[in-house]
Curated annotation (Swiss-Prot):
It comes from Tobacco mosaic virus (strain Korean NC 82) (TMV). InterPro entries: TMV_movement (IPR001022), Viral_movement (IPR028919). The keyword RNA-binding applies. This is Movement protein. GO terms for cellular component: host cell cytoplasm; host cell plasmodesma; host cytoskeleton. Residues 216-238 are annotated as: Disordered.
């Protein structure tokens, strides 16, 4: 199976297959189809927002099957002048889960002075095709101490995922094939790590409060179509701590108009 898509996200960073599994026909291996999604964007206009994100954009799903979200690459761009103060916390959410601590899949913090940032998450769990079609993932964004007039966009986020689609769970054993991201920097951070360095309020608690204020699903907005006015920035400012050690590779990015890529697609 050809698992590296040139000029795209490196699938091998998320899925660890043996040499035999890479060359065997699909009938002899449990992994049937590995895909990279199209890029989905969120334009952040508010200091705190919960937006839907399509992590399976352009991915061909199997009727009555499953899809495993093996990996996720998030790229952010601050639309600000250099050396601005403040920062942002970004949290990936599974909106199906009622308990906020179980709904948060991973969170990350970065300073506004870092103009472009990129981090990776390995969710490593599967959902049914029926659930996937309901767009179950959201992104909770909390911007702090960025002084920008209302109505403008201080931050843009782009998402691309690596996923595996399959028809049956029997003999899949995919969890044994998932590896951790091998970069030395803090590309994948659990909420505990982020809270230790930066957060006064954990993102799971922030999510619970946000849901209680707005209603869990009724007020969630599409990221790209959001035209709401940004709320007034929080005046309680704390010094931003920079994690450092970020690794940014240009060849890991996917162009805006790129198509979803099938690394290997065989009969199911």
């Amino acid at each position: 199976m050809a698992l590296v898509v040139k000029g795209k996200v490196n699938i091998n960073e998320f899925i660890d297959l043996t040499k035999m599994e890479k060359i065997l026909p699909s009938m002899f291996t449990p992994v049937k189809s590995v895909m990279c999604s199209k890029v989905d964007k969120i334009m952040v206009h508010e200091n705190e927002s919960l937006s839907e994100v399509n992590l399976l954009k352009g991915v061909k799903l199997i009727d009555s099957g499953y899809v495993c979200l093996a990996g996720l690459v998030v790229t952010g761009e601050w639309n600000l002048p250099d050396n601005c103060r403040g920062g942002v916390s970004v949290c990936l959410v599974d909106k199906r889960m009622e308990r906020a601590d179980e709904a948060t899949l991973g969170s990350y913090y970065t300073a506004a002075a870092k103009k472009r940032f990129q981090f990776k998450v390995v969710p490593n769990y599967a959902i049914t095709t029926q659930d996937a079609m309901k767009n179950v993932w959201q992104v909770l964004v909390n911007i702090r101490n960025v002084k920008m007039s209302a109505g403008f966009c201080p931050l843009s986020l782009e998402f691309v995922s690596v996923c595996i689609v399959y028809r049956n769970n029997i003999k899949l054993g995919l969890r044994e094939k998932i590896t951790n991201v091998r970069d030395g920097g803090p590309m994948e951070l659990t909420e505990e790590v982020v809270d230790e360095f930066m957060e006064d309020v954990p993102m799971s608690i922030r999510l619970a409060k946000f849901r209680s204020r707005t209603g869990k699903k009724s007020d969630v907005r599409k990221g790209k179509n959001s035209s709401s006015v940004r709320s007034v920035p929080n005046k309680n400012y704390r010094n931003v701590k920079d994690f450092g050690g970020m690794s940014f590779k240009k060849n890991n990015l996917i162009d805006d108009d790129s198509e979803a890529t099938v690394a290997e697609s065989d009969s199911f």
